[in-house]
Amino acid sequence: MRIRMNAPTFDHVLIVASDLERSIEFYTLIGFEHLETIQRPNDRVAVMRLGGVKVEIMNLPEGEETLREPRRLTDLGFRHIGFKVYDLTSVYERLKDKISFDSPPRKIQGRGNRMTVFFKDPDGVEMHFVQE
């Protein structure tokens, strides 16, 4: 499939974090590269990269409140972030004492040999590793 010159391409995702340093440590642990931290008048943004994708992590600005309600599988909008890995068992073994997984790796019903394991970042953003 050819990409047209004026067609949009993916640039970044922004995640708001309650503790920027803790989030930088977490995302680095799961494989992201920390490119830089930008200080702006009211907040700081850590620019992270995994493969060719950038994720910006912004600290919750001072004095701002946030509301985090548990999401249901059927809620509209953003659900989770999936990361492809080539050896899910070794990734799980390396990280299981450092982050909290929902369960050990398991097969995805109806998807052949595809396996997955879910976890959350320090602020509850749902993620999973998947192996084809």
Question: PLM features: what roles do these ranges have?
Answer:
Residues 9, 42-44, 51, 77, ...:
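Exposed loop/turn and edge beta-strand positions of beta-sandwich/beta-sheet ligand-binding modules
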Residues 17-21, 75-123:
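Vicinal oxygen chelate
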Residues 1-5, 70:
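A detector for short, charged/polar N-terminal pre-domain segments
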Residues 43, 64-69, 104:
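A short, acidic/glycine-rich surface segment
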Residues 48-52, 119-122, 132:
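Active-site beta-strand termini and strand-to-loop segments that position acidic
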Residues 15-55:
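Core segments of cupin and vicinal oxygen chelate
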